[in-house]
Amino acid sequence: MATLNPRDVVIVDGVRSAMGKSKNGMFRNVRADSLSAELVRALVARNQFDVNEVEDLIWGCVNQTLEQGMNIGRNIGLLAGLPKTVAGQTVNRLCGSSMQAIHTAAAQIATNQGDIFIIGGVEHMGHVGMMHGIDLNPEASKHYAKASNMMGLTAEMLGRMNGITREEQDAFGVESHRRAWAATQEGRFKNEIIGVEGHDANGFKILCDIDEVIRPDANLEAFKALKPVFDPKGGSVTAATSSALSDGASAMLLMSAERAQALGLKPRAVIRSMAVAGCDAAIMGYGPVPATQKALKRAGLSIADIQTVELNEAFAAQGLSVLKGLGLYDKQDIVNLNGGAIALGHPLGCSGARITTTLLNVMEQQDTQIGLATMCIGLGQGIATVIERV
């Protein structure tokens, strides 16, 4: 178990919503800010502390327009009933946004710029399309290929560079669904999912506490029958081996070790190190490799010390390429044990805090000590966080 210093950054708790389908899903009548506010209220209710002490609410969100616009972080705090004295901000590092929220809060805690932070992220991809309102500079094509904006093509590129076969991708995708459904049936998500009111297919109100995107019937035969979707003629990436479009939110409570101790709150983990890194936009999915290497060096660890891993499965080709790059290809029994984004979906701004929360729960379930959460980021970045249970 880790020994804590006063300014160490500890994770007190983490929660998430169930993941809803973006097309006519269970959250089709629920706004992104309302969904997020439910999680903030739940986080406060689960942990006894004075909310007046919260320095800032930091929320990750990628497409900050429509219901996700006008500093959704501040709006979430107000909707959740936090005191008006609690500040709120929204951060955007594309797919890594809510992990960046963790890093931003952690840096402030470590430098004594606040003791208690609520962080999280959200993306309602059913209400706010991924490309809604986007106007890219034509000059950018001088610096990276236009095709680098098409995530599926970057996955195809990684697959070819790293010799990832169609068969490997299909098997990886099926296994993601199998693990996620097994985790659901065995109650392994219960500690992290907060039930939020939504609607079933017939329009009746229901409590949404089971991930809607998982396919319990996922099988190799069905996956093999699908045609490549991004490179129809010579590709290998299909809809089934890509992360699903989904709607969801996540939230975490971070504190300084000394404040958590003073409040009598038992930390679940301490943040050992953090890192971001850039890479070529054409292989954006490889970003977790340099980011993880940086984070491990800062923690004084090697990949062999990592006992549990959560990696954002943007695509099977991407995930498998990262595992090869990190030397984890033959250690998939420690990676995404409760399934990944192929089964759960990847609501962009939500995913960073979601996978970190899931990592924490898996570490507790497996009784492991040191874990890694890492993600690729569009336009060529990676982000990584190393945590240790306390």
Curated annotation (Swiss-Prot):
Membership in a protein family: Belongs to the thiolase-like superfamily. Thiolase family.
Pathway: Lipid metabolism; fatty acid beta-oxidation
Top-level division of the source organism's lineage: Bacteria
Main location group: cytoplasm
Subcellular location field: Cytoplasm
PROSITE patterns: THIOLASE_1, THIOLASE_2, THIOLASE_3
Gene name linked to the record: fadA
Main function: Catalyzes the final step of fatty acid oxidation in which acetyl-CoA is released and the CoA ester of a fatty acid two carbons shorter is formed.
Keyword presence, Transferase: yes
Gene Ontology biological-process entries: fatty acid beta-oxidation; phenylacetate catabolic process
Organism name: Acinetobacter baumannii (strain AYE)
Catalytic activity, reaction form: an acyl-CoA + acetyl-CoA = a 3-oxoacyl-CoA + CoA
Molecular function in Gene Ontology: acetyl-CoA C-acyltransferase activity
Enzyme class: transferase
The UniProt record lists the keyword Cytoplasm: yes
Entry EC no(s): 2.3.1.16
Pfam families assigned: Thiolase_C (PF02803), Thiolase_N (PF00108)
Subunit structure: Heterotetramer of two alpha chains (FadB) and two beta chains (FadA).
Residue positions of the active site: 95 (acyl-thioester intermediate), 346 (proton acceptor), 376 (proton acceptor)
One annotated Gene Ontology cellular component of this protein: cytoplasm
Protein's recorded name: 3-ketoacyl-CoA thiolase
Keywords, comma-separated and alphabetical: Acyltransferase, Cytoplasm, Fatty acid metabolism, Lipid degradation, Lipid metabolism, Transferase
Entry-linked InterPro entries: FadA (IPR012805), Thiolase (IPR002155), Thiolase-like (IPR016039), Thiolase-like_sf_Thiolase (IPR050215), Thiolase_acyl_enz_int_AS (IPR020615), Thiolase_AS (IPR020610), Thiolase_C (IPR020617), Thiolase_CS (IPR020613)
